[in-house]
Amino acid sequence: MKQKPEDWLNDVPDNQEDDEDDEIIWVSKSEIKRDAEALKDLGAELVDLGKNALEKIPLDDDLRAAVELAQRITREGRRRQLQLIGKLLRARDPEPIQIALDKLNNRHNQQVALFHKLEQLRDRLITEGDDVIPEILALYSHADRQQLRSLVRNAQKEKAANKPPKAARQIFQYLRELAETTN
């Protein structure tokens, strides 16, 4: 006996009915490979970190040991160790590790931006002289006007005499100290 199409739709058992909660999500093989490669790259970033930076990353003992071993290995062994680190990361939630790495990178970027700002202030101090000092005093209220003026005068003399920029380095160091005590 042949069933009409309408009949076989009604014959679906209760346990096979479509539930929106039980929706199956199909992931392509290429997407799985991309995710695995991204985790391997995350592992490579961990391996490239220094010892102090690595301590700030939340890793369990197995993963930390694998990363420390990969830091000591070279060439083909390192590649295989990176594969293992990627495998270990697939078994864990990589999000806290990625967040900690992003914080480390962001802190480094902020420090570089601060150094560029301080270098620009130093250059302006040397070229414009006393006109920039009130701006620095506004930024860093605990700055010593007299010391700044002395350093600026010395830097301008060195620049005019084509001497090495010893005073310019001292200005930068003083500005960096001011910035560190402010933060």
Swiss-Prot record:
InterPro entries: DarP, DarP_sf. It is found in: Cytoplasm. GO terms for molecular function: ribosome binding; rRNA binding. One of its GO terms (biological process) is assembly of large subunit precursor of preribosome. GO terms for cellular component: cytosol. Keywords: Cytoplasm, Ribosome biogenesis, RNA-binding, rRNA-binding. Residues 1-21 are annotated as: Disordered. The keyword Oxidoreductase does not apply. CDD domains: YjgA-like. Member of a network of 50S ribosomal subunit biogenesis factors which assembles along the 30S-50S interface, preventing incorrect 23S rRNA structures from forming. Promotes peptidyl transferase center (PTC) maturation. Belongs to the DarP family. This is Dual-action ribosomal maturation protein DarP. The lineage of its organism: Bacteria, Pseudomonadati, Pseudomonadota, Gammaproteobacteria, Enterobacterales.
